Amino acid sequence: MYIRRATPEDFDKIMGIYKIAQNIMIESGNPTQWGHTNPKKETVKEDIKKKISYLICDDENIYGVFVIVEGDEPTYKVIENGNWLNNEEYITIHRIASNGAKKGVFKCLINYCKSKSNNIRIDTHNDNKIMQKLIERNGFKKCGRIY
C-alpha cells in the first residue's frame, strides 16, 4: 500500500469509504460522532481542493482516506485534564476512515505522517473505542480532552 493525494476524480470513492466508516461507527456504539451525515460532502471537496486529503491505496483499490492539517488546530487551544507533550509545531490527522477491506491501513497512514513530522496530534470521539485502540497501539499517548 502507498499514500497519494486525493483528486476530484476520487470524490465518489472517498464518500463511499466514509459511508462504510459511518456504519461501522454506528454499529460499534459510536452513533453520534459522524452519524450518517459527516464528514459533509462540502468538507470533503474542500479537503481535496486544499490538497490536504490523502488516500491509502494500491494500484487497484483505495482502502482508506485521511486529512493532514499543518499548523495550529483551533480545537487544541484548550485542553482539559492534561497537557500536550510539547508546544512545538505539529501536524494533525483528521477524518480517518477505512473500508475495512485490508489490514494495515492505519499503520500505513501513521508511517506516512511520521515521515512528514515527528510531532503528530490526533484526536477522536470519546465513544470511538476502535480508533482509541488503534491510536494507543501505534504509540500515541492520551494528553487530555479537547472540544
Residue ranges of predicted features:
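Conserved GNAT acetyl-CoA-binding A-motif
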Residues: 115-127
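Conserved acetyl-CoA-binding loop-helix of GNAT-fold acetyltransferases
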Residues: 98-115, 132-137
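Conserved catalytic-core motifs of GNAT/GCN5-like acyltransferases
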Residues: 123, 141-147
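A short beta-loop-alpha structural element at the N-terminal edge
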Residues: 2-16
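Conserved beta-strand in the GNAT
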Residues: 55, 61-71
